[in-house]
Amino acid sequence: MAAFSEMGVMPEIAQAVEEMDWLLPTDIQAESIPLILGGGDVLMAAETGSGKTGAFSIPVIQIVYETLKDQQEGKKGKTTIKTGASVLNKWQMNPYDRGSAFAIGSDGLCCQSREVKEWHGCRGTRGLLKGKHYYEVSCHDQGLCRVGWSTMQASLDLGTDKFGFGFGGTGKKSHNKQFDNYGEEFTMHDTIGCYLDIDKGHVKFSKNGKDLGLAFEIPAHIKNQALFPACVLKNAELKFNFGEEEFKFPPKDGFVALSKAPDNYIVKSQHTGNAQVSQTKFLPNAPKALIVEPSRELAEQTLNNVKQFKKYIDNPKLRELLIIGGVAARDQLSVLDNGVDIVVGTPGRLDDLVSTGKLNLSQVRFLVLDEADGLLSQGYSDFINRMHNQIPQITCDGKRLQVIVCSATLHSFDVKKLSEKIMHFPTWVDLKGEDSVPDTVHHVVVPVNPKTDKLWERLGKNHIRTDDVHAKDNTRPGANSPEMWSEAIKILKGEYAVRAIKEHKMDQAIIFCRTKIDCDNLEQYFMQQGGGPDKKGHQFSCVCLHGDRKPHERKQNLERFKKGDVRFLICTDVAARGIDIHGVPYVINVTLPDEKQNYVHRIGRVGRAERMGLAISLVATEKEKVWYHVCSNRGKGCYNTRLKEDGGCTIWYNEMQLLSEIEEHLNCTISQVEPDIKVPVDEFDGKVTYGQKRAAGGGNYKGHVDVLAPTVQELAALEKEAQTSFLHLGYLPNQLFRTF
């Protein structure tokens, strides 16, 4: 308890932590908790099982409680908040609605970005709902720019989504990431006129007074939304003229300057630099903290941690809510209506509730993105940006929005790019470092070579069902085609998985498959061996965990595996990410992961807490044709076996290349064993029992000491010499002075 209290954690949380037998904070907790309590944005990386959830949950719970306590006691905060409302009383570019490298002059009209690699944009302080309007932009240098109109929902990167319309210096018009030729190029000293006819739904532009014609027709889905003047720059400078000064090229045909627009046509920006809701106004559906997880299992796990940490917090009590798919929305809405302080959820259902206004983000103080690399790899970057844009950057009590990003791979390009966009000078806490395999993990590769192992020919039809990638191909023995070898690999992998279980008498293991259909097929094959979900204690008892299983089934399957009711958990990478399963003695990789970092994540699940573990990877020596769905339904009902480059949903998977990349990443050569999967015992005293703790006595410590002994002796001699010299120097000065 004292260890956590020394970091500033309140006694009520420290007491709950102590009851969980957390005597000391983990490294990631010791580094991150004080930083978050201090009000900073934090990027953290640590291994699964390192206490990462506690590292962000504990300070988030404490600050949410303190905020609610201040509100309860009527405290307004120590800082007087400067309002940005005065900015909205005139037409100018909005300092509260711009990119991080976008500068605005004191007049609010001269704009500049000197970032040469990235685009940075800005919107105006006011928008329009009706009428015919016009403004001018003058180019001050030869940098790149796009100017035009966008709604409040649009990205600041003008023209890259369906809510903005841009015209660029390269002579292209842009909308929804579609760049088409329009008008002509423009550069320094040119003046671009931006026309908006909301009544007709038309957008057009002019160059130095020359009408370039119709550029866009405004789609129906945004006709009732206000459109704001907008631009995006890359190493460029512009100056806007909304009509306060005389236009260089006055508009015709009834278009009027923005500054002359009637008040009933105008909508002010929502971005004012303040929280959108006053401190005293209570909104039951407006949480103080939002934690986003990539999977429902991880969300449930995090919510359980939050419940444990807040156990002794009272007056006011904290109210938490889990928002995930597969649960009746009306139940979640009922809890929201009664008030909620902390929300933990997955992107799909969160997006639904936010977009319909059921979940209000106007009072969010904390935004936590757990397993951010997983969220980005699943394609949720747009959702994250949209959500972040709706959260006020400064709360009504003068506190800044805190963003916490947790990722297994902080140094990935996507995570870096995200952090630069949504975080404010974040502190990096990277305790993971370079990927490496723990000493408690023995990992080996089993080559799956259909050319030397002809078992697949002899099995006939008594083999695992394959994924139907080759349903239309000739894969009979003797075809000698890539398709035949690929099908043979799929059959052999099923046999090798069974062989590995029998050879090592596995009593518990996680088995990773590449796709959901592979998981289903392996589960079915284990059922043919007499096992399956309902065969408790059987050698091949197993359950499946992947996105196509119903939520209650996934939860039930995970619990059954944890309790030991079944021996094997067959799952995909996405489903297993971050799940709190400790000390599993075995892992089988039926297929190597697409990303080399995931190899370390997989095998890192064995051998925890000083328990030895064995990870076996089945690696095909020939290329295997596998599913790679790019279709809109993400594989459901898809039978398009053509290659991706031919418009299909398959690719050739080269596991030998992937193995090479993994070995280069880990800077080691992974041992290979024969197809009989007999693993040589060469650890410690030659007696290794996987799943058991290392034998006491130091293992190979003696050999380590023998190697270091000469160096230690040399250091001891140097230490003795240094101390002797110091003692002599104590008398030497007096002797020197006597001489003179």
UniProtKB/Swiss-Prot annotation:
GO terms for cellular component: cleavage body; cytoplasm; cytoplasmic stress granule; cytosol; mitochondrion; nucleus; ribonucleoprotein complex; tRNA-splicing ligase complex. Residues 2-428 form the Helicase ATP-binding domain. ATP binds at A46, E47, T48, G49, S50, G51, K52, T53. It catalyses: ATP + H2O = ADP + phosphate + H(+). CDD domains: DEADc_DDX1, SF2_C_DEAD, SPRY_DDX1. Residues 493-681 form the Helicase C-terminal domain. Phosphorylated by ATM kinase; phosphorylation is increased in response to ionizing radiation (IR). It comes from the Eukaryota. A motif (DEAD box) lies at residues 370-373. Its main location: nucleus. Residues 70-247 form the B30.2/SPRY domain. GO terms for biological process: defense response to virus; double-strand break repair; innate immune response; mRNA processing; positive regulation of canonical NF-kappaB signal transduction; positive regulation of myeloid dendritic cell cytokine production; protein localization to cytoplasmic stress granule; response to exogenous dsRNA. SMART domains: DEXDc (SM00487), HELICc (SM00490), SPRY (SM00449). GO terms for molecular function: ATP binding; ATP hydrolysis activity; chromatin binding; DNA binding; DNA/RNA helicase activity; double-stranded RNA binding; exonuclease activity; nuclease activity. It is found in: Nucleus; Cytoplasm, Cytosol; Cytoplasm; Cytoplasmic granule. It holds the Pfam family SPRY. The modification N6-acetyllysine is found at K239, K268, K281. Residues 1-448 are annotated as: Interaction with dsRNA. InterPro entries: B30.2/SPRY, B30.2/SPRY_sf, ConA-like_dom_sf, DEAD/DEAH_box_helicase_dom, Helicase_ATP-bd, Helicase_C-like, P-loop_NTPase, RNA_helicase_DEAD_Q_motif. Found in a multi-helicase-TICAM1 complex at least composed of DHX36, DDX1, DDX21 and TICAM1; this complex exists in resting cells with or without poly(I:C) RNA ligand stimulation. Interacts with DHX36. Interacts (via B30.2/SPRY domain) with DDX21 (via N-terminus); this interaction serves as bridges to TICAM1. Interacts with FAM98A (via N- and C-terminus). Interacts with MBNL1. Interacts with CSTF2. Interacts with HNRNPK. Interacts with ATM. Interacts with RELA (via C-terminus). Component of the tRNA-splicing ligase complex. Interacts with PHF5A (via C-terminus). Interacts with PQBP1. Acts as an ATP-dependent RNA helicase, able to unwind both RNA-RNA and RNA-DNA duplexes. Possesses 5' single-stranded RNA overhang nuclease activity. Possesses ATPase activity on various RNA, but not DNA polynucleotides. May play a role in RNA clearance at DNA double-strand breaks (DSBs), thereby facilitating the template-guided repair of transcriptionally active regions of the genome. Together with RELA, acts as a coactivator to enhance NF-kappa-B-mediated transcriptional activation. Acts as a positive transcriptional regulator of cyclin CCND2 expression. The helicase domain is involved in the stimulation of RELA transcriptional activity. This is ATP-dependent RNA helicase DDX1. It comes from Mus musculus (Mouse).
